[in-house]
A protein has these predicted regions:
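A short helix->loop->beta-strand "cap" motif at the edges of active sites that frequently abuts
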Residues: 79-82, 184-188
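Glycine-rich SAM-binding Motif I of class I
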Residues: 61-66
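Short beta->alpha hinge that forms the Motif I/post-I loop of the SAM-binding pocket
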Residues: 89, 172, 195
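Short SAM/SAH-binding signature in class I
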Residues: 137-139, 153-162
Length: 207
């Protein structure tokens, strides 16, 4: 069953389970661009690469994926393949994905393509294919720590996302971050919106 969502008066989706917004007041696209894309040096970092692999903790409404896909489409120097890997314990309904992107001309057409494949997400790993196989979305449904430990992923960029640490401490825990760090290589760049001291300390322990 899809996770329950409330929609606030300003149009922001709100998780009843975690008691937190899905994105900041500046808007999902602005947050995705300013925090995650720019924070990871994208799109400049992937220029001319054969492929680029992005790992995200917390798929949520899928807006970071959609914003990254839109940036890939708009970039003449884009990599031949974009592989976006994300973990999500509580997937939302496909209709909520569409609503979250509604009214955004850059994201709405891509959200409709995502909506068409976003079904049957039982616990486990699911592969969604777009752009004739040039954009891949791998969704690992289940506990983030467990899923990250089980996958043999390698990431060039990491979007460290999720609800606030006080609302969802598990996804920011040291074991989860250590499992995430296993997917990184020298040169992997990480971006996150949180400045919580506990998260900074845990990341420092991950090296």
């Amino acid at each position: 069953m899809a996770d329950g969502i409330d929609w606030l008066d300003d149009g922001t989706p709100y998780s009843k389970r975690f008691g937190d917004r899905y994105h900041g007041e500046q808007g999902a696209l602005a947050q995705a661009q300013a925090v995650f894309l720019q924070g990871c040096g994208l799109p400049q970092a992937w220029a001319g690469a054969r492929q680029w692999r992005i790992l995200e903790t917390g798929f949520g409404m899928g807006l970071n994926f959609l914003a990254t896909w839109a940036a890939w489409r708009a970039d003449a120097q884009r990599p031949q393949m974009l592989h976006f890997m994300s973990v999500e314990a509580w997937p939302v309904a496909a209709s909520d994905l569409l609503r979250a992107a509604q009214g955004n001309p850059a994201l709405e057409p891509l959200a409709r393509q995502l909506h068409a494949q976003y079904w049957g997400l039982l616990p486990g790993v699911h592969r969604l294919v777009f752009e004739g196989g040039r954009v891949l979305l791998t969704l690992a449904i289940g506990d983030a720590h467990m899923q990250l430990r089980e996958q043999a992923w390698q990431a060039d960029s990491v979007y460290l996302d999720g609800f606030a640490p006080q609302c969802n401490p598990d996804i920011w825990s040291l074991p989860t971050l250590q499992a995430m760090a296993r997917c990184c290589h020298p040169g992997t760049r990480l971006a996150s919106w949180t400045v919580a001291g506990s998260v900074r300390e845990a990341l420092a322990q991950c090296g």
